[in-house]
Amino acid sequence: MRRRGAIGIGTLIVFIAMVLVAAVAAGVIIGTAGYLEQKAQAAGRQTTQEVASGIKVLNVYGYTNATPPSNGTIERMAIFITPNAGSEGIDLSNVKIVLSDGRRLVVYNYSGSFQNAESVKDLFNMTYVGVWNSTNGTASFGIAVINDIGSEMQGTHPTLEFGDMVALCVWTTMFEYEDKDGIGPSTRITGKVIPERGAAGVLDFTTPATFSYNVMVLQ
């Protein structure tokens, strides 16, 4: 009887130990599953933000200062952008613009030059829009604010929110056409407006065969 009792107690101890081990294992599994679920949710949110966030290029305008315009090159460009629908705020101080004419590639960074241009009648007039003066001859861009829904945009870290619209102002005199600074006629330009996060705005156009006006629509 004593041997049977000892065996029974031993079996009970083993059973209890197995239950405890199973409980600990279950706790570890549940904890790991919870952690993985949170990681998956965070990754899903991040992926959604990456897909939804980004920059949309609305229009691109070019400018030549020559008289007549057909004698000149495109020396300046204004790239109008807005956020994609559902996009988070985009810090324009971290944006880069990449432009290429197939022979040269230029990367522009934010110059820190920022101006409210909602009431400006001539965006390419250097008297009214000072960002052109501060970026002249450099691989940097200035920002002319066309529409600021929340009136919260400021120069140090200008943040583009849904409904906002700005013009990124760049000099294109780093390019050359027939020994003249600037972009010539019938030239294909490709590039991107690249935010820190999210989809880049696409630039892809061919300049007119003849420059009939000082200001021209490029894209």
From Swiss-Prot:
Family annotation (Pfam families): Arch_flagellin
Origin: domain of life: Archaea
Molecular function (Gene Ontology), one example: structural molecule activity
One GO cellular component term noted in the UniProt record for this chain: archaeal-type flagellum
Swiss-Prot/TrEMBL GO biological process terms: archaeal or bacterial-type flagellum-dependent cell motility
Pro-peptide region(s): 1-5
UniProt keyword terms in alphabetical order: Archaeal flagellum
Principal localisation: other
Subcellular location: Archaeal flagellum
InterPro entries registered for this protein in UniProt: Flagellin/pilin_N_arc, Flagellin_arc
NCBIfam families assigned to the protein according to its UniProt record, in alphabetical order: arch_flag_Nterm, PRK08541.1
Biological function: Flagellin is the subunit protein which polymerizes to form the filaments of archaeal flagella.
UniProt cross-references to PANTHER family, sorted A to Z: FLAGELLIN B1
Family according to the record: Belongs to the archaeal flagellin family.
The protein, known as: Flagellin B4
